[in-house]
Structures are given as C-alpha cells and as structure tokens.
C-alpha cells in the first residue's frame, strides 16, 4: 500500500454502476450504433480486469421510492496493488438514452437512484454519453448535498464492444478509484484523469482526450505504476448534515447568451424578455468584456433586466482564465448589476443558477451573492487582485465626467472605485486635478473620497 494514501478499510468495497446509456454501451445495428441492454454480462463479465473468476453473487439494489430491493448479479475485480477487491453490480435504466436527450428529469433519476442506495454502497459510477456529460456532472454536483462518498461519471468515444475503444480504461479507472479512494465529490474520469465534475467541459468530438478541466488540475491520475491523488485539491463538505438531494430545478428558467461582435441591444432585450426567464449566463469576451452598444444601450438593457429581478452571470468564452473587472467594459457590466462568474465554466454556471433559483428560501439577492462564491469547488475564489493594469479607463472616465460637470457620472464611477481612482495617475502622470472642477459640491465629493491635494 502506498505511503500516505487514503483507502477505504476492508478487503472488498462495493460500487454500484448506474447505466444511463451513451456510446459506451452501444452495439452495431442496421441503423448505426444504438444503446443496448445487458452491459454487465456482455461487456464486463468476460474481461479479466472486471472479473477475477470467483463465483458471482447477488447483492440487493433499491429500485424505487418504496424501498423495493431487487437482487442484482455482482462480480469482483482481481485484487489490486492496494490489496483490495472491488465488488460491483450494474443497474441499467429501463430506457437507455443518447446523452443529447438527457435533461433535468434524467438528472433527477440519477440523483434519486444514488439517494436510495446511498447506505448500501461505498461509491457510485455513472455511465453516460459524452455529449452532455459535463452538464450532468455540474448538475449533480449541486443536486447531491452534503455528499460523503465518491460519485464518478464516465463514458467513452467508442463502444466497449469495438476493437479500438477507450471504454475499457475509462470504466476500469473509474471503478478502481471509486473502490479505493475516498474522494467525496462528483467527478468525471476520462483518459486516465479524474477531474472535478463541475470544472469540466468537452473539448473534442473524436479524440480519446475528450474532456478538460481548464482551470483546475486533475484530482487524480492513473499511470502504469500507481494512482496519484492530489489530496490537497479534494473538496470535502464541512457541513455535518446528512446526505440529501435537491431535485427541484429551474432549468426551464435559465438560458445562455454568447456575446459576439455587433450583437444588437434589441436581440439581447428579446432574450431577456422571454416568458419565465429568471437567469442568464452571459458568455463574454476575454476577462468578462462586452460591447456597451450605441450610447451604452446594451449596458442599459442588462441594467434594466437586473432591476426586473433577472440574475445575470458573467463567464468568459475563453477556455482558461477568469472574469475580472480589469477593463472598463467588464467594470461597466458589474456596475449594471451583472454578477462576475469568475472562472466557472458555462456548464457549471447554468447548473448552479438553475439550482439556486429553485431553492425555496433564497431571495434574488441571495442567489446573486451565492453565484459569486464557491459552493462545490466550481470556481476559484479570488481574495485579492493578482494583476491589474493602471486604471486609465476609469480614470479617463472620471476626468471626463469632472470636465463636463456631471456630478451623477462622477458618483457612479466612484461607486466601484472609491478609495483609489481619485488619486490615480495615467501613464502621463495626469490626475483628476488636471481638469477643471466646475462645482464646489464635486470638489467636496472628491475630497471626501480621499483626494490627495498635496
């Protein structure tokens, strides 16, 4: 056994594999690949890595809300380098789905299956199609509350019955980690890497390295020698409440909107006026930037929607990096009431927003506040600004507002930048004192905010 590793006690752990469908269980047909039942006996039992040759035994699986127990055939893996077997059973959904058809009802079905069997198994592996896998990972990470056991989702780019496939290593790796390491998170295992589920996104339609975790390193990796777990990255709930699930979701009340060059305020307004819309994930340029539109018309559209109670969350279109008000466009969005989503993926932001909007005791302001903080490790909390350009954009705006004598604009700028911009200088050394201050009240306001006259 590895020094410093964390393994579950006992010679044999129990894992429930939940088969929802997807490429991993598909077989050839006259109409191409289709999901097929009988995965355990057809795909797993004949393979030595999944079957040590010992006599299979039945273990009970709860199949409905009434607590009905049904015996399922189980097999056992050969003994691992950690001197432990993993015994597993497969529960197949009656209707196997292509993951492009998975929706909130499918997520609820998965969550309920885990909840019913939570005390009977040490861990859970969910087999799922790859198209919507990152969405399901993010959704489950919020639906499964106070999780204390591993839940690992995986799938494949090629069916297990095909000669060249990634299904076998993906499933075996998931089973080994689930059965040996106490990583109490919703994770995604693919291509020998275990990633936090709500940090993942699909990056390839064909490659075996189909998923990435752009802003967080893998929680674990498997090599020919061992499984390496980065225990310092593992998220653990500090809440002592019992495991529960939240199945009410507002998925029909949230939407994503991708900013593009030349986007018209009228188009955005139409989206924000959709019947029943409560939340919007705004996919912006770079570090959270979006065009303001002619005379700030687009920014006003966002501000008006926020005033109507719509929660708008700003995430970047970039693969890596974070939303941060380094530039004026991002700062203007933040002043309009748009919530910075930091380095959340679009999938995680949508899942989190629909989860929070469905919680009965949260106000809109509560939802806004919780969207900006980490609940399940879905974003990196920034405690301080690591890097910032000199604030020339806001400084220029302030000087311009002062020169116009617009006290209202000056107050609006100082809302977000109070305490530093009044004493900032641009690359030429110009400060707010360079331009004429037209009103005594404005001068008094700047002095109250800390203007240095020395």
Predicted regions: what they are:
Residues 421-422, 453:
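Ankyrin-repeat inter-repeat connecting loop/turn
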Residues 405-415, 440-452:
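Ankyrin repeat structural motif
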Residues 126-149, 292-301, 328:
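Short Gly/Thr/Asp-enriched flexible loops that form oxyanion-binding sites at enzyme active sites
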Residues 160-201, 339, 363:
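Short, glycine-/small-residue-rich phosphate/pyrophosphate-handling segment
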Residues 2-3, 9-11, 269, 292-392:
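ATP/nucleoside-binding phosphotransfer catalytic cores, i.e., glycine-rich phosphate-binding loops
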Residues 135-169, 173-181, 304-316:
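Short, acidic/small-residue loops that bind anionic groups at enzyme active sites
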Residues 1-116, 361:
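ATP/NTP phosphate-donor binding region
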């Amino acid at each position: 056994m590895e020094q410093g590793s964390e393994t579950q006690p006992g010679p044999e752990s129990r894992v429930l594999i939940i088969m929802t469908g997807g490429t991993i269980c598909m077989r050839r047909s006259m109409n191409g690949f289709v999901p097929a039942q009988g995965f355990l006996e057809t795909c797993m039992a004949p393979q030595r890595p999944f079957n040590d040759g010992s006599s299979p035994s039945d273990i009970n699986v709860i199949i409905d809300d009434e607590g009905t127990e049904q015996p399922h055939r189980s097999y056992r893996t050969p003994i691992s380098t950690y001197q432990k077997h993993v015994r597993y059973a497969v529960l197949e959904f009656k209707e196997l789905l292509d993951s492009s058809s998975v929706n909130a009802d499918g997520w609820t079905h998965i969550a309920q299956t885990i909840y019913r069997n939570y005390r009977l198994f040490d861990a859970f592996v969910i087999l799922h199609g790859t198209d919507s896998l990152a969405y399901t990972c993010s959704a489950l990470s919020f639906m499964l509350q106070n999780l204390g056991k591993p839940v690992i989702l995986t799938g494949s780019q090629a069916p297990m019955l095909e000669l060249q496939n990634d299904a076998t290593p993906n499933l075996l790796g998931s089973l080994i980690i689930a059965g040996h390491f106490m990583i109490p998170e919703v994770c995604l295992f693919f291509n020998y890497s275990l990633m936090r589920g709500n940090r993942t996104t699909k990056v390839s339609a064909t490659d075996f390295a189909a998923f990435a975790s752009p802003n967080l390193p893998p929680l674990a990796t498997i090599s020919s020698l061992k499984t390496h777990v980065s225990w310092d990255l593992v998220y653990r709930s500090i809440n002592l409440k019992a495991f529960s699930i939240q199945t009410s979701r507002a998925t029909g009340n949230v939407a994503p909107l991708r900013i593009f060059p030349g986007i018209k305020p009228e188009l955005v307004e139409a989206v924000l006026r959709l019947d029943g819309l409560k939340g919007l994930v705004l996919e912006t340029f770079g570090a959270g930037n979006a065009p303001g539109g002619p005379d700030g018309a687009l920014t006003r559209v966002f501000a008006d929607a926020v005033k109507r109670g719509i929660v708008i969350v700003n995430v970047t279109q970039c693969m890596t990096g974070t939303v941060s008000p380094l530039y004026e466009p991002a700062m203007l969005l933040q002043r309009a009431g748009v919530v910075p989503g930091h380095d959340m993926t679009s999938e995680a932001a949508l899942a989190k927003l629909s989860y929070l909007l469905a919680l009965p005791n949260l106000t809109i302001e509560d939802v806004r506040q919780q969207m900006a903080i980490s609940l399940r490790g879905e974003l990196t909390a920034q405690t301080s600004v690591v890097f910032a350009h000199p604030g020339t954009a806001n400084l220029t705006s302030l000087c311009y507002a002062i020169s116009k004598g617009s006290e209202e604009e000056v107050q609006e700028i100082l809302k977000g930048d109070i305490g530093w911009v009044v004493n900032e200088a641009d690359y030429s050394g110009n400060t707010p004192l360079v331009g004429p201050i037209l009103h005594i009240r404005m001068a008094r306001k700047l002095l109250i905010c800390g203007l240095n006259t020395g």
